[in-house]
Design a protein with these regions (language model features):
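ABC family nucleotide-binding domain
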Residues: 5-7, 12-218
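Conserved switch/coupling elements of ABC/ABC-like ATPase nucleotide-binding domains
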Residues: 219-224
């Protein structure tokens, strides 16, 4: 997905063992748009994000990414290997749990998406660390950082390879209100600077209020 791609979700449905999680989900995300997804606990918001990234399989409907030149990538047409390669190149992730590797220093953690693409770019890694206010901490280990600093590492890592789409699942859920607001400031500043689209799952009214659009996921579809 380039920075100018459109995400289109059509009639998406997912169930586990015959039990519906969600159904008839339709929405689109325009290039550079920030969309917040809210909804009751257990309605499948995190599962939906996993489907958007091709990490989880859905049962009905389509997920399509259309580039500015009109080239469409339909995730259902990609096998597991092709999906993984596509995801590594075009999607970034930020989660409530930071998922940093404790045996790697901060700079090495940020560089992971580039490494998976077979790239080495120390200058880009340093630029992202500078952008999130951790420029002097690249050699530190994750256990030496605070929760807010770890989420900054996660943001830098998610955007270091310039993805067109950032998927964020409760990225401020473990943070105090002041730190959460600072992390949201940083997340929005960096995605907008890169022209990336942002899809955010959140229970935070404060975070959702900053979105271009707020969608509510229900068992029977998307509202908003």
């Amino acid at each position: 997905m380039s920075s100018h791609s459109t995400l289109t979700v059509q009639n998406l449905g997912k169930h586990y063992g015959g039990t519906p999680v969600f159904a008839q989900v339709d929405f689109a995300v325009q290039p550079g748009e920030f969309v917040a997804i809210v909804g009751d606990s257990g309605v499948g918001k995190s599962t939906l994000l996993n489907c958007l990234a091709g990490l989880d399989q859905w049962d009905e409907g389509d997920i399509t990414y259309t580039a500015a030149n009109g080239t469409a990538t339909r995730l259902a047409d990609l096998d597991d290997t092709a999906r993984a390669l596509w995801r590594r190149a075009h999607v970034g992730f930020v989660f409530q749990a930071f998922h940093v590797l404790p045996h790697l220093d901060v700079a090495q953690n940020v560089a992971l998406p580039l490494m998976l693409l077979g790239q080495t770019d120390p200058a880009r890694v340093q630029a992202m660390l500078d952008a999130v206010g951790l420029g002097a901490l690249g050699s530190r280990l994750p256990q030496q950082l605070s929760g807010g600093q770890l989420q900054r590492v996660a943001i830098a890592r998610a955007l270091v390879h310039r993805p067109g789409l950032l998927l964020a699942d409760e990225p401020t859920g473990n943070l105090d209100p002041t730190t959460a607001a600072l992390v949201m400031d940083l997340l929005l500043a960096q995605t907008r600077e890169q022209g990336a689209s942002l899809v955010l799952v959140t229970h935070s009214d404060a975070a959702a209020a900053r979105a271009d659009r707020v969608l509510r996921l229900t068992a029977s579809g998307m509202v908003g």
